[in-house]
Amino acid sequence: MKSCGLLPFTVLLALGILAPWTVEGGKNDAIKIGACPAKKPAQCLKLEKPQCRTDWECPGKQRCCQDACGSKCVNPVPIRKPVWRKPGRCVKTQARCMMLNPPNVCQRDGQCDGKYKCCEGICGKVCLPPM
């Protein structure tokens, strides 16, 4: 008889423990509003210690964005209407890096500034001027 009265208490206790965990777990995968600024082709002289791993480690509206040297908290730029293809062709690269999964700076042309296109570079996709 006493175990029936204990069941609702146990359920409420479990929900009280699990509810904050589910909220926090989802936050790590979510992203904040706005887009990371487009990355320009650049050489990194020294890899820096990452400032962040997720947007939620950055203050306010800042997003955790990758640049040539690592990840940093930066102010996002407004998201424009997505552009999948810009005019022009990508330059063919003759060399390839030996990295198994090279990091991509972009996925489509709309992520690159101005007339730059998202092209296959020596080591992953990068924003390059078209031919």
From Swiss-Prot:
Consequence of gene loss (knockout): Mutant mice show delayed epithelial wound healing and an increased inflammatory response at the site of wounding, possibly due to increased elastase activity. Mutant mice show an increased tendency to die from toxic shock after exposure to bacterial lipopolysaccharide (LPS). Mutant mice are highly susceptible to M.tuberculosis; all die within 50 days after infection. Mutant mice are highly susceptible infection by L.major. Contrary to what is observed with wild-type, the parasites are not restricted to the initial site of infection, but spread to spleen, liver and bone morrow.
Cysteines joined through disulfide linkages: C36-C65, C44-C69, C52-C64, C58-C73, C90-C119, C97-C123, C106-C118, C112-C127
SMART domains per record: WAP
Any one Gene Ontology molecular-function term assigned to this protein's record: mRNA binding
Induction: Up-regulated by bacterial lipopolysaccharide. Up-regulated in lung after infection with M.tuberculosis. Down-regulated by IFNG. Up-regulated in lung in response to bacterial pneumonia. Up-regulated in macrophages after exposure to L.major. Not up-regulated in spleen in response to bacterial pneumonia. Up-regulated in wounded skin.
Annotated site residues (Reactive bond for chymotrypsin, trypsin and elastase) in this chain: M98, M99
Coiled-coil intervals, chain numbering: none
Cellular compartment(s): Secreted
Listed CDD domains: WAP
A GO term from the CC aspect: Golgi apparatus
Keyword Hydrolase: no
GO biological process: antibacterial humoral response; host-mediated perturbation of symbiont process; immune response; innate immune response; negative regulation of viral genome replication; response to lipopolysaccharide
Tissue: Detected in bronchial epithelial cells. Detected in bronchoalveolar fluid after infection with M.tuberculosis (at protein level). Highest expression in lung, spleen, intestine and epididymis with lower levels in liver and seminal vesicle. No expression in brain, heart, kidney and muscle.
Gene3D superfamilies: Elafin-like
Residues of the WAP domain: 29-77, 83-131
Signal peptide: 1-25
InterPro entries: Elafin-like_sf, WAP_dom, WAP_four-disulfide_core
Keywords (A to Z) from UniProt: Antibiotic, Antimicrobial, Disulfide bond, Immunity, Innate immunity, Protease inhibitor, Repeat, Secreted, Serine protease inhibitor, Signal
Region Elastase inhibitory domain, residue ranges: 85-131
Oligomeric form and interacting partners: Interacts with GRN; interaction protects progranulin from proteolysis.
Role, per record: Acid-stable proteinase inhibitor with strong affinities for trypsin, chymotrypsin, elastase, and cathepsin G. Modulates the innate immune response after bacterial infection. Contributes to regulate the inflammatory and immune responses to the intracellular parasite L.major. Down-regulates responses to bacterial lipopolysaccharide (LPS). Plays a role in regulating the activation of NF-kappa-B and inflammatory responses. Has antimicrobial activity against mycobacteria, but not against salmonella. Contributes to normal resistance against infection by M.tuberculosis.
Name of this chain's protein: Antileukoproteinase
Gene: Slpi
